[in-house]
Amino acid sequence: MPRIGVMFDRDLSPEDLQAFAAAVEEAGADDLWVVEDLGWAGSISTAALALAATSRIRVGIGIAPVPLRSPALLAMELAMLARVYPGRLVAGLGHGVSEWMRQLGVEPKSKLAMLEETVLAVRGLLRGDLVTVDGREVHLDGVRLVHPPAVQPAIVTGVVRPRSLELSGRVADGTIIAEGNGPAEIQAALTHIRRGGATDEHELILFAYLHVNDDPADAAKVTGAMVEGQASWLGVPPSEVFSLIGPVAEVPGKVRSLVEAGTGTIVLRPLGPDPIPQVRAALSALGR
């Protein structure tokens, strides 16, 4: 069986996070995933609150854009969480949305170099190494953490394009694949990831829209705008956007198809006004 996670959507009220996290844990999920989009909430503080509100589940950051923080600061923040909550943190890193990075004046000259150099520097710092880097984008001169964690968190990347997927296979512990991608896209992504040198231990994490509803017309009213927007981003018709939208009886079969394609963790992103009942229904159908 895969790991089953749940996303705390960026549009939910921050005050609801801890109750949401506790409910997800009680419902039997393996993970809670948080996001970081410009103007919403910071991922490190969100992850800290989620970890504090739970006792068992893994909390994933999906993702922290690497141009926003020095690798040293990022490692310091992650080390603190990993020490206090050993074995319960996954650090997802990515390029960040180019438009947002330009808004903030932090867009790197080389996105690939920025991501690779950050992943390697952060991993070294979390190991307790004395890290010196003079790369294309990252520059550190003899930095070491005073309190490195005993259990190092996995570092995964949320990336899309072939060269970035190969980079993830080369340097990361896993790869996050965005909503709307199904079994065929998973297999295509894995081809690039493995070309980068990924082993069987590389964790493939897929975000998937969830809306349990037996009425297709009603489901379309709730989810249509989100699906259409993602279809536009992916460059496909809305009908080709993979999702867990529909009758709950279809959820196990769709999840099985993702696992057979190579997915190790499926993160449910519930759509609609009542996310927790949606999550409970899906987890129950999956035998949780």
Regions found by a protein language model. Give the residues of each.
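Active-site-adjacent structural elements that line small-molecule/cofactor binding pockets in enzymes
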Residues: 1-288
